[in-house]
Amino acid sequence: MVRIRLRRMGMKHKPAYRVVIADSHAPRDGKFIETIGHYNPQAQPKVVFIKEDRARYWLSVGAQPSDTVVRLLKNLGVVDAEGKLIGEAPAKVEAPVKKAKKAVSKAAVAPVAVAAPVKAEAEAGEFAGSVRPLADGSAPEGYAIKGNQNSMLYHVPGSRYYNSTVAELWFDTVESAEAAGFRAPGQKSAE
């Protein structure tokens, strides 16, 4: 079960709390799903900040507030004394839903455009000897070396990570991959 509760912060003898969404079995200061506010009972006046829209959302999907959080939410006007939601979510949320329903109904009536045929050829990459993957993600003919632009690594068939790598570029030879600045996994960069 998901709970809305307080997570203790602050120093010894000076507690401050974060209002968090957490699993009911998680420890008090353990892992949590989301922080929706904070509460400082030591400050004068007491500081309470809770994101009402997120509190309403979590209450609407079944999160159970602790007794202290019920009191804080009651003071903010989000829940009644029993912890039940007061009123509905803001009307701003309903307007996009109505617009989306209208758009869906118009789309159902509107004629469907025919998609352009998929190119059988791959687009040339930024580097010599490289091409982009085909539309289905497969390798173009003659290109077997996968290149990952985020890590600047290339993977040859049969290497450890070849099957798990998603190719962002395909190279025809190892030399063209290295000329483009890519390196084999396990090698240190030249920097």
Curated annotation (Swiss-Prot):
GO terms for cellular component: cytoplasm; small ribosomal subunit. One of its GO terms (biological process) is translation. Signal peptide: none annotated. The keyword Ribosomal protein applies. It comes from the Bacteria. Pfam families: Ribosomal_S16 (PF00886). GO terms for molecular function: structural constituent of ribosome. Gene3D superfamilies: 3.30.1320.10. Keywords: Ribonucleoprotein, Ribosomal protein. The keyword Ribonucleoprotein applies. Belongs to the bacterial ribosomal protein bS16 family. This is Small ribosomal subunit protein bS16. It comes from Herpetosiphon aurantiacus (strain ATCC 23779 / DSM 785 / 114-95).
